[in-house]
From Swiss-Prot:
Principal location: membrane
Protein name: Elongation factor 4
Catalytic activity: GTP + H2O = GDP + phosphate + H(+)
GO terms (BP aspect): positive regulation of translation; translation
PROSITE patterns, alphabetized: G_TR_1 (PS00301), G_TR_2 (PS51722)
Subcellular location(s) of the protein: Cell inner membrane
Electron transport is among the record's keywords: no
Organism: Picosynechococcus sp. (strain ATCC 27264 / PCC 7002 / PR-6) (Agmenellum quadruplicatum)
Keyword terms: Cell inner membrane, Cell membrane, GTP-binding, Hydrolase, Membrane, Nucleotide-binding, Protein biosynthesis
Enzyme Commission code(s) on record: 3.6.5.n1
Stored SUPFAM superfamilies: EF-G C-terminal domain-like, P-loop containing nucleoside triphosphate hydrolases
Residues binding GTP: D19, H20, G21, K22, S23, T24, N136, K137, I138, D139
C-alpha cells in the first residue's frame, strides 16, 4: 500500500459543531472517491455505534483512507481522521488533530459559528494545521451565506475570500473540497529514515484480536512482525496484523511516515494503548516520545446501582467490557445502606456519563439508578494532608478540615443577543463570576463566565437550552481549583442519615437546598404507621425539617358517648404502640426519591 510517495499523502480532519453536517460530508467524500461502493452506503457511515446514529453525534473516532485522482492527473491518498465534536471529548479531539496537517472547518450556513466549533479551531491552530473553511447546508431556505462568511472572518480570523459553498446533502461542492485538500493541506514531513514514532489517536477492543490501535506514523516505518514499545505504558508487543482503514480494515505489510493505519498485537486492554501514547521500535527506540500525552482524568463522579440486587454481577461484567473500549471510564465497588451494592464511576463530563449509562441500559439490558453527580473536591486537613474526594460521604468532619477547594471552569457561551440577560441571570444564580463579553456581529454575543464545575454538572446545559430556546451553545475548560465555603448536607429520614442523598453544597445555598429536599421527600416517601421526621442537617445542626404524618386507625369508632377517660385510655394505648413502632420500624425510601433529587432545581 506504500505505492504513493509521501508528497501525495494528505491527512485532514473535519471540525464542526454538532448538527452542522460533518458526518454527511464525510459520507459524500467516501462516495465521490468511490471508497465505499454505492450499494454499501448508509447514512453516517463512519458512526458505527447505534447510539451515535440515533443522537447524531460522533462519540468514538473513526478514520478512512480515500484515493482521489486530482485535476493534475496524479493520484493522492487522503486520510480522513474524524473527530468527536463534543466538549467532553476534547482531549481525543486534540490527539486526532495532532495526527493531521489540515482541517476542514465546516459551518452551517443557517446557524453560524458555534461555541464548540470555536474551541476546536483553537485546538487546530495550536497544532499548526492549515484550516479550510467550508459553508455547508447552503441549500436550506434559511441559509445566510454572506452573513456567516463575515462571521467566520470576524470570529475565527480566517481569510474567507475562497470559502467553499457546499451542501453535503445535495452533493454540491464536494469536488471543490477534495481539490482544496490536495492544493492547500501540506503533505506530511518526509522522515522515513528516522527511528519509528507513531501517534495513537484511537483504540477499541475486538473480542477476537484484542485491542485494535489506530495510529498515524510520524517518523520512520513500521512492518508486520516488528516488536514495538508503547512509550507511556512501557509495554512491548509484536505486531500480528497491520493495515489501513479503507474504511473497512485492509491488511498491508508496512506503513511509512505520513500514513494512517491500524495494528493488532494481542493487547489485553485499551488502558495499555492510551490515546496520545507514542509507538516506537523496541529494538531501536526513539529518544523522546511525541509531545502532548496526558492521562484522561475523570471529572464527574456518580454512583450506579442496579434496581435489582441480583444484577450486580451483570453490572460489573458490563462495566468491565465498556472499560475495555473506554479508557477514560473508571469505577470501583460501593455500598449504600439505601441502595445496596453498586459502583462509584468516574466520567469525563456529563455527556460521557449519559452515554455510558445509556449503553449499559441498552447493550446490556440493565436497569440502573444513578446518584447525584459530584465533582472531585480537594480537602486539606488540619494535619496538612491533602485528600481528593469524589463522594460526599468521604468528607472529614468540620473540625478536622482546614479548607475545601473545588474545581472551576471557564464557560464560553455563544448566543443571540436577545438572550444575554437570561444567560447572565442563570450564571449569577450558579455562583458565576463574569469575565468578558464580546459581540461578534450585531446579533451574536460571546459571554465568558467562570463557574464552579459542581454548579454545571447537574442541569446547567438543559437550563441554558430551555432559556434560549436551543439557540445558545456552550464550551468549557478547566481552569483550576479554588477555595470555597462548602459544607456537607446530610438528609436524615426517621433520624437515620441516608448516605446516597448526602451532597456537598455551598454554605449560602445549603438552607434552600435542604428545604427543597425535605419538601420533595415529604411528597415522595409513602406514609407509614408512625410519624416520620425528615431533616436536612449540616453536622449536628438541623437546618430544615418536615414531617410525614402517621396513618392511624380510628380507635374511638366503637365508643358511643361514654366516659372521656375511656377514650383517653384508648388514644394513649395507640400512641404508645406508635412510639414503639417508630423506634423499631424502618422507612423505605423509594427510588423515585433518589431520581427526584437529581432533578431538584438549584
Amino acid at each position: 500500500m506504500t505505492d504513493v510517495p509521501v508528497s501525495r499523502i494528505r491527512n485532514f480532519s473535519i471540525i464542526a459543531h454538532i448538527d452542522h453536517g460533518k458526518s454527511t460530508l464525510a459520507d459524500r467524500m467516501l462516495q465521490d472517491t468511490q471508497t465505499v461502493a454505492q450499494r454499501d452506503m448508509k447514512e453516517q457511515f463512519l458512526d458505527n455505534m447505534e447510539l451515535e446514529r440515533e443522537r447524531g453525534i460522533t462519540i468514538k473516532l473513526q478514520a478512512a483512507r480515500m484515493r482521489y485522482v486530482a485535476k493534475d492527473g496524479e493520484e493522492y491518498i487522503l486520510n480522513l481522521i474524524d473527530t468527536p465534536g463534543h466538549v467532553d471529548f476534547s482531549y481525543e479531539v486534540s490527539r486526532s488533530l495532532a495526527a493531521c496537517e489540515g482541517a476542514l472547518l465546516v459551518v452551517d450556513a443557517s446557524q453560524g459559528v458555534e461555541a464548540q466549533t470555536l474551541a476546536n479551531v483553537y485546538l487546530a491552530l495550536d497544532n499548526n494545521l492549515e484550516i479550510i473553511p467550508v459553508l455547508n447546508k447552503i441549500d436550506l431556505p434559511g441559509a445566510e451565506p454572506d452573513r456567516v462568511t463575515e462571521e467566520i472572518e470576524e470570529v475565527v480570523g480566517l481569510d474567507c475570500t475562497d470559502i467553499i459553498r457546499a451542501s453535503a446533502k445535495q452533493g454540491l461542492g464536494i469536488n471543490d473540497i477534495l481539490e482544496s485538500i490536495v492544493q492547500q493541506v501540506p503533505p506530511p514531513a518526509d522522515t522515513i529514515d528516522q527511528p519509528l514514532r507513531a501517534l495513537i489517536f484511537d483504540s477499541y477492543y475486538d473480542p477476537y484480536r484484542g485491542v485494535i490501535v489506530y495510529f498515524r506514523v510520524m517518523d520512520g516505518e513500521v512492518k508486520k512482525g516488528d516488536k514495538v514499545r508503547l512509550m507511556a505504558s512501557k509495554k512491548e508487543y509484536e505486531i500480528d496484523e497491520l493495515g489501513v482503514l479503507a474504511p473497512n480494515q485492509v491488511q498491508v505489510d508496512a506503513l511509512h511516515a505520513g500514513e494512517v493505519g491500524y495494528f493488532a498485537a494481542a493487547i489485553k486492554s485499551v488502558e495499555d494503548a492510551r490515546v496520545g501514547d507514542t509507538i516506537t521500535s523496541a529494538v531501536h527506540p526513539a529518544p523522546a516520545p511525541l509531545p502532548g500525552y496526558t492521562e484522561a482524568k475523570p471529572m464527574v463522579f456518580c454512583g450506579l446501582f442496579p434496581t435489582d440486587a441480583d444484577q450486580y454481577s451483570d453490572l460489573r461484567d458490563a462495566l468491565d467490557k465498556l472499560k475495555l473500549n473506554d479508557a477514560a471510564l473508571s469505577f470501583e465497588p460501593e455500598t449504600s445502606s439505601a441502595m445496596g451494592f453498586g459502583f462509584r464511576c468516574g466520567f469525563l463530563g456529563l455527556l460521557h456519563l449519559e452515554i455510558v449509562q445509556e449503553r449499559l441500559e441498552r447493550e446490556y439490558n440493565l436497569d440502573l439508578i444513578t446518584t447525584a453527580p459530584s465533582v472531585v473536591y480537594r480537602v486539606t486537613t488540619t494535619d496538612g494532608e491533602v485528600m481528593e474526594i469524589d463522594n460526599p460521604s468521604q468528607l472529614p468532619d468540620p473540625q478536622k478540615r482546614e479548607k475545601i477547594e473545588e474545581p472551576y471552569i471557564q464557560v464560553d457561551v455563544i448566543t443571540p443577543e436577545e438572550f444575554v440577560g437570561t444567560i447572565m441571570d442563570l450564571c449569577q444564580t450558579r455562583r458565576g463570576i463574569f469575565k468578558d463579553m464580546k459581540y461578534f456581529t450585531e446579533s451574536r454575543t460571546n459571554i465568558i463566565y467562570e463557574l464552579p464545575l459542581a454548579e454545571v454538572v447537574t442541569d446547567f446545559f438543559d437550563q441554558l437550552k430551555s432559556r434560549t430556546r436551543g439557540y445558545a451553545s456552550m464550551e468549557y475548560q478547566l481552569i483550576g481549583y479554588r477555595v470555597g465555603q462548602l459544607v456537607r448536607l446530610d438528609i436524615l429520614v426517621n433520624k437515620d442519615s441516608v448516605d446516597s442523598l448526602a451532597m456537598i453544597v455551598h454554605r449560602d445555598k445549603a438552607y434552600n437546598v435542604g428545604r427543597a429536599m425535605a419538601e420533595k421527600l415529604k411528597e415522595l416517601i409513602p406514609r407509614h404507621q408512625f410519624k416520620i421526621p425528615i431533616q436536612a442537617a449540616i453536622g449536628s445542626k438541623i437546618i430544615a425539617s418536615e414531617h410525614i404524618p402517621a396513618l392511624r386507625k380510628d380507635v374511638l369508632a366503637k365508643c358511643y358517648g361514654g366516659d372521656i377517660s375511656r377514650k383517653k385510655k384508648l388514644l394513649q394505648k395507640q400512641a404508645k404502640g406508635k412510639k414503639r413502632m417508630k423506634s423499631i420500624g424502618t422507612v423505605d425510601v423509594p427510588q423515585e426519591a433518589f431520581m427526584a433529587v437529581l432533578k431538584l432545581d438549584q
